[in-house]
Swiss-Prot record:
Sequence similarity: Belongs to the UPF0235 family.
GO CC, any one term: cytoplasm
Gene3D superfamilies from the UniProt entry: YggU-like
Record-linked InterPro entries: DUF167, YggU-like_sf
Name the UniProt record assigns to this protein: UPF0235 protein DET1292
NCBIfam families xref list: DUF167 family protein
């Protein structure tokens, strides 16, 4: 498999075991996301990638959790999404557009 291009990375704070998946905004420089899945056996991590893929219209294969696989603070890499596109999509979602 060929090496991927340099990704755009974002710092996230994940709150597992929520009632539903939800993007809630920024807190202390981290994008805060609630995930309904339990934090066991990678379920919350898989649910996070699934949610981000759907939310940002980006293939799951282009999203990777780089750091924080077992913690709430994570670094996620996007290989096919630029920082500008990411920020525009997140801003639109947070505004309710």
């Amino acid at each position: 498999m060929p090496a991927k291009e340099s990704p755009f990375r974002v710092n996230l704070k994940i709150l597992p075991s929520a009632q539903r998946n939800e993007l809630t905004g920024y807190e202390n420089g981290l994008l805060k996301i609630k995930i309904a899945a339990q934090p066991e056996k990678g379920k919350a991590n898989k649910a996070l990638v699934d949610y981000l893929s759907e939310l940002l219209d980006t293939p799951k294969s282009e999203i990777e959790i780089c750091r924080g696989l077992s913690g709430r603070n994570k670094v996620v890499a996007f290989y096919s999404l630029s920082q500008a596109d990411f920020e525009a999509k997140i801003s639109a979602i947070l505004r309710g557009s």
